[in-house]
């Protein structure tokens, strides 16, 4: 009935059967960001936020999010992830705003890709920074979240 991969013959949602796919090394890298004011920036780099170490907590949240992606994205397969890395890079915009660029890199050896895990990790990392610093300023801006690259699998490699 349907040519959609995640819809069954009755028109209802289904998770795709990947049992016949080849096992390959798969990686994905995703980006997100959050722009903060100078007070929050100083608290983060000086590690003086009242809730604790913002970047360490956000990094752990990103790792946990990648590991739990299949529990929050309905058609995502649970995967045995072989590596997760969350990295940070500050961009100083002017004397009043600072952007924390977040890179999440996820890898596995499996039958389906890890793009959603990388995107979920990057998103959760930015959300955790917001959560830990919102008492200082609720005007932070979470920026674009997107896939930077992926490798492995039938569709091949992708680079933004």
UniProtKB/Swiss-Prot annotation:
The active site is at 131. The keyword ATP-binding does not apply. Pathway: Cofactor biosynthesis; molybdopterin biosynthesis. Its EC number is 4.6.1.17. Pfam families: MoaC. CDD domains: MoaC_PE (cd01420). Substrate binds at residues 75-77, 116-117. GO terms for biological process: Mo-molybdopterin cofactor biosynthetic process. It is an enzyme of class 4 (lyase). GO terms for molecular function: cyclic pyranopterin monophosphate synthase activity. It catalyses: (8S)-3',8-cyclo-7,8-dihydroguanosine 5'-triphosphate = cyclic pyranopterin phosphate + diphosphate. Keywords: Lyase, Molybdenum cofactor biosynthesis. Homohexamer; trimer of dimers. Catalyzes the conversion of (8S)-3',8-cyclo-7,8-dihydroguanosine 5'-triphosphate to cyclic pyranopterin monophosphate (cPMP). HAMAP family: MoaC_B (MF_01224_B). Belongs to the MoaC family. This is Cyclic pyranopterin monophosphate synthase.
């Amino acid at each position: 009935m349907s040519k959609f991969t995640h819809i069954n013959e009755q028109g209802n949602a289904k998770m795709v059967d990947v049992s016949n796919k080849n096992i390959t090394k798969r990686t994905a890298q995703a980006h997100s960001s959050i722009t903060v004011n100078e007070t929050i920036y100083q608290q983060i780099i000086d590690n003086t936020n009242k809730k604790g170490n913002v970047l360490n907590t956000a990094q752990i949240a990103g790792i946990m999010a990648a590991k739990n992606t299949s529990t929050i994205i309905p058609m995502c397969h649970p995967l045995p992830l072989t590596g997760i890395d969350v990295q940070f890079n500050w961009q100083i915009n002017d004397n009043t705003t600072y952007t924390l660029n977040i890179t999440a890199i996820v890898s596995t050896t499996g039958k389906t890709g890890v793009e959603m895990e990388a995107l979920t990790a990057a998103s959760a990392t930015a959300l955790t920074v917001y959560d830990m610093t919102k008492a200082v300023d609720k005007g932070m801006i979470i920026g674009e979240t997107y896939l930077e690259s992926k490798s492995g699998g039938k569709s091949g490699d992708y680079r933004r």
